[in-house]
Amino acid sequence: MKIPEAVNHINVQNNIDLVDGKINPNKDTKALQKNISCVTNSSSSGISEKHLDHCADTVKSFLRKSIAAQSYSKMFSQGTSFKSLNLSIEAPSGARSSFRSLEHLDKVSRHYLSEIIQKTHPLSSDERHLLSIIINSDFNFRHQSNANLSNNTLNIKSFDKIKSENIQTYKNTFSEDIEEIANHDFVFFGVEISNHQETLPLNKTHHTVDFGANAYIIDHDSPYGYMTLTDHFDNAIPPVFYHEHQSFFLDNFKEVVDEVSRYVHGNQGKTDVPIFNTKDMRLGIGLHLIDFIRKSKDQRFREFCYNKNIDPVSLDRIINFVFQLEYHIPRMLSTDNFKKIRLRDISLEDAIKASNYEEINNKVTDKKMAHQALAYSLGNAKSDMALYLLSKFNFTKQDIAEMEKMNNNMYCELYDVEYLLSEDSANYKVLEYFISNGLVDVNKRFQKANSGDTMLDNAMKSKDSKTIDFLLKNGAVSGKRFGR
């Protein structure tokens, strides 16, 4: 895909490299083997510690690149949106993904960069100045969660990685995301302009959503990351009244507050979401912002954007008002260079959903709170938390009866415990614990949801053979046996 000559006329302080760098997996493998060989018999070769560190870094770099290739191969070969846009690649024939998927990322990035260059060339002096500020800005990347993801090291895993390790946690990745863009092997971050003295983070929501009470902030990008101007799946910018900093814009501007709500997309319609690799992302952001400013009828907003002395916080307000930047790192982030900032308290239910043991232990200090926690665990199908609480507290049948009577817990108000133990998302081991320890009656008829049914009826509806067999061995019968 040819990049138009117009790119050569963008005069910015940074040298924007748009050259198509080819990746040769065989060459990289040979280079790796050469570096690995240097550590063989190191005890007798007298190799310096610095040289060994270099070899270790080479291995880490190669592994990181290989993992990234797998994540992008999955995204570009499985996502139906890429297929409909003719931006897909073939799935790898073998077990391993080649580096072609990384080459493809660069090609896709150049494609979207070429589109916006053609649309915005030539630039005025004000536009070139704004673009140079953005290109030379440092970014902070913010991941929010109710989970405790760090001790001395921050470890954030993709949904696909979490699932492969059988870790149970509340997810923000839905079936539509997986089907259409298949980016469930990436870790997601909001993006902020740094170089300011304000309290971090500048933003606490993304696309109007509060993703958690803990903000984990890093100030370094990934050589294999990619950026979208919006949420990758939902590329509609919300109206100003849903914006976190709405008062800033409502108090200062008029026309632009009605212009901001829109789909951000490429030339092939609203499902065509621009993607930029790490190298191209600042240029992509800057040119798309200039395109929006040109279309705006709000003269005061335009003047504000082109202010020669615009400060980093104001620039961030603009960018995360016009867009909702989202950065993606393949599979997993592990770093000791981060900041953890507590934004608010975490509710007990949110701590349960996030499997935040530290927070749960701080909140659940007596049997009464344990009743609440167990109800939240069953209601959210959090078997790991349910089994943890059952092992920590000596629950009796009377405790379960008292738990069911709680009027300040939605799950106890709407469902019988027996229903929660046997519905389609329930866990067999939790059900087994309750019945084996005599905490519930196997044939108690539901009094709330699905009134008159029993646990066997629930299991039959979900066609869970393992649960059905266990219930039958313990004398379970259908509620129909009792009549209605």
Swiss-Prot record:
User: Which keywords does UniProt give here?
Assistant: ANK repeat, Lyase, NAD, Plasmid, Repeat, Secreted, Toxin, Virulence
Principal place of residence: secreted
Repeat ANK: residue ranges? 414-444, 451-480
Q: Does the keyword Endoplasmic reticulum apply?
A: no
Briefly state the protein's biological role: ADP-riboxanase effector that mediates arginine ADP-riboxanation of host caspases. ADP-riboxanation of host apoptotic caspases (CASP3 and CASP9) prevents their activation, thereby inhibiting host cell extrinsic and intrinsic apoptosis. Does not catalyze ADP-riboxanation of host CASP4/CASP11 or CASP8. In contrast to Ospc1 and OspC3, not able to inactivate host calmodulin.
| Reactions catalysed, as given in the entry | L-arginyl-[protein] + NAD(+) = ADP-riboxanated L-argininyl-[protein] + nicotinamide + NH4(+) + H(+)
Q: Name one GO cellular component term.
A: extracellular region
Localization per record: Secreted
Q: Which domain of life is it from?
A: Bacteria
Which positions are catalytic residues?
326
Q: Which residues bind NAD(+)?
A: 143-145, 149, 162, 172, 188, 206, 211, 231, 326
Positions of the site: Important for catalytic activity?
143, 188, 211, 231
**GO MF term set:** ADP-riboxanase activity; toxin activity
Q: Which Pfam families match?
A: Shigella_OspC
Q: What is its EC number?
A: 4.3.99.-
Q: What is the name listed in the Swiss-Prot or TrEMBL entry for this protein? A: Arginine ADP-riboxanase OspC2
Belongs to which family?
Belongs to the OspC family.
